[in-house]
A protein has these predicted regions:
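Nucleotidyltransferase catalytic cores
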Residues: 1-18, 50, 162-217
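N-terminal regions immediately upstream of nucleotidyltransferase
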Residues: 1-76, 87-97, 123-126
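Weak global preference for isoleucine
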Residues: 4, 9, 23, 56, ...
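Alpha-helical structural motif
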Residues: 34, 98, 213-217
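Conserved catalytic core of two-metal-ion nucleotidyltransferases
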Residues: 42-46, 64, 96-183, 189-191
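A structural signal for short, well-ordered beta-strand segments
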Residues: 79-81, 136
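Long, well-ordered hydrophobic secondary-structure segments characteristic of membrane-embedded
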Residues: 82-86
Length: 217
């Protein structure tokens, strides 16, 4: 019984610690609203990008639900985003052209123009003072990898400012959605293992351990 109580106290302490580190729901929703607004601007009917049906979606910690609070008040939340343009092919466009297309559309909005940082190596960055900054990564489909199916069906080709402006057949690759799916599948097995370990530590059956008490890394 004493062992279970100690485990319970430790679990509550860890839960509180994780909650203190986590991004507040209000901030999360605010960031989501802002990047959805960016996506709406990129895809407006009058936008030159509208024919490519721009899609903005999060990648990295924001897509995995692992965003943590900035260390100090001077730091900001980092929101990594993909700007996917459908229909564009590496055979008919260059990385420089893709990067410029997205950047020009952002600059056409007076608000975003003021928020834009200097062009990054792979991203366009919008700086929301004392809140967060959004790194927007232009991307197109990686047809060769997607043809292999599975997690690779989400593969992307991305831009790199260090690449030449010509239609280089070798593009940097990325697969944020595939990674999220892989991560979640791995978490399922980790969850089951942690639940079993917790049950063993308190000499209880697995079914006696509530799911909410199991915190995956």
């Amino acid at each position: 019984m004493e062992t279970f109580e100690k485990a319970s106290i430790l679990s509550r302490s860890l839960d509180q610690f994780a909650e203190d580190l986590d991004i507040p729901e209000g901030k999360f929703l605010e960031a989501k609203k802002r990047y959805e607004s960016v996506g709406a601007w990129l895809g407006k009917d009058e936008s030159p990008l509208s024919v490519y049906t721009p899609e903005i979606y999060p990648q990295g910690s924001f897509s995995l639900g692992t965003v943590i609070k900035p260390i100090t008040n001077k730091d900001e939340y980092d929101v990594d985003l993909v700007c996917f343009l459908a229909g564009l092919k590496k055979e008919t466009t260059s990385q420089a052209e893709l990067k410029t297309m997205v950047g020009d559309r952002l600059k056409a909005n007076e608000t975003y123009k003021k928020l834009l940082d200097q062009e990054g190596r792979r991203c366009w960055t919008l700086n929301y003072a004392n809140e967060f900054h959004m790194d927007i990564l232009p991307a197109i489909t990686d047809d060769a990898l997607r043809a292999q199916g599975g997690l690779l069906s989400h593969a992307l080709l991305i831009t790199d400012i260090q690449k030449i402006a010509d239609k280089d057949p070798e593009w940097p690759k990325s697969n944020p959605r595939g990674y999220v799916l892989w991560f979640k599948s791995r978490q399922e097995s980790v969850f089951l293992a942690l639940r079993k370990r917790l049950a063993e530590s308190v000499k209880a059956s697995v079914d006696e351990i509530p799911e909410y008490r199991v915190k995956t890394p």
